[in-house]
């Protein structure tokens, strides 16, 4: 029974990340929340014929200068890394966090889904989709753009990270239980 833990790290963009997690689990957009509180969500997701019990730990956020706790590395099999398309700085921070994760895993291939959130705010866009695609390709990761407000691809993000884990590990194992951070 392999333990699959997925980590969602989102520096400086707590509203976008939290709203994405809440939209995925609760099916509604979260306007207000406390960004300093770590939250846990659970949801059952079906991929093909398999059922996965996802446990999402919505972290209070990290920045490029933070020391990553071992809980973000040890026993974690996949990551959803989210930045805001309206913030170039958040995109740059995600690059730095990925490098720390990659080094922490011994530079092995990581199942990662890179998500450009807030796609509904196109007039305020600072990061073009092509930049996200290029960065994800350099990592061997999947790239998606989403909008928590419009519920655009929120389910697909978590389905994709499960598929990425399976692809990298080449096996789902007997029990499909995912812990998301």
UniProtKB/Swiss-Prot annotation:
Enzyme kind, highest EC tier: hydrolase
Keyword GTP-binding: yes
Species: Bos taurus
Oligomer and partners: Interacts with MTOR.
Alphabetical list of NCBIfam families matching this protein: small_GTP
Family per record: Belongs to the small GTPase superfamily. Rheb family.
Function, as annotated: Binds GTP and exhibits intrinsic GTPase activity. May activate NF-kappa-B-mediated gene transcription. Promotes signal transduction through MTOR, activates RPS6KB1, and is a downstream target of the small GTPase-activating proteins TSC1 and TSC2.
Domain of life from the UniProt record: Eukaryota
One GO CC term on file: plasma membrane
Name recorded for this polypeptide: GTPase RhebL1
Protein's GO biological process: small GTPase-mediated signal transduction
InterPro entries: P-loop_NTPase, Small_GTP-bd, Small_GTPase, Small_GTPase_Ras-type
Motif interval(s): Effector region: 33-41
Reactions mediated catalytically: GTP + H2O = GDP + phosphate + H(+)
Binding site for Mg(2+): 36
UniProt keyword annotation of Coiled coil present: no
Upper lineage: Eukaryota, Metazoa, Chordata, Craniata, Vertebrata
Residues with a covalently attached lipid (S-farnesyl cysteine): 178
Subcellular localization(s) per the UniProt record: Endomembrane system; Cytoplasm
């Amino acid at each position: 029974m392999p333990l699959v833990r997925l980590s969602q790290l989102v520096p400086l963009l707590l509203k976008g990340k939290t709203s994405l997690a809440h939209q995925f689990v609760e099916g509604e957009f979260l306007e207000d929340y406390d960004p300093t509180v770590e939250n846990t969500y659970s949801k059952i997701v079906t991929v093909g014929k398999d059922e996965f019990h996802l446990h999402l730990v919505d972290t209070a956020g990290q920045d490029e200068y933070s020391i990553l706790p071992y809980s973000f590395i040890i026993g974690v099999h996949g990551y959803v890394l989210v930045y805001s398309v309206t913030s170039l700085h958040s995109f740059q921070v995600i690059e730095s966090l990925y490098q720390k994760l990659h080094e922490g895993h011994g530079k092995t291939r990581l199942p990662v889904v890179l998500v450009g959130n807030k796609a509904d705010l196109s007039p305020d866009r600072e990061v073009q989709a092509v930049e996200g695609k290029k960065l994800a390709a350099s990592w061997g990761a999947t790239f998606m753009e989403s909008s928590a407000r419009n519920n655009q691809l929120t389910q697909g993000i978590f389905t994709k990270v499960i598929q990425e884990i399976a692809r990298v590990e080449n096996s789902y194992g007997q029990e499909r239980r995912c812990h998301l951070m």
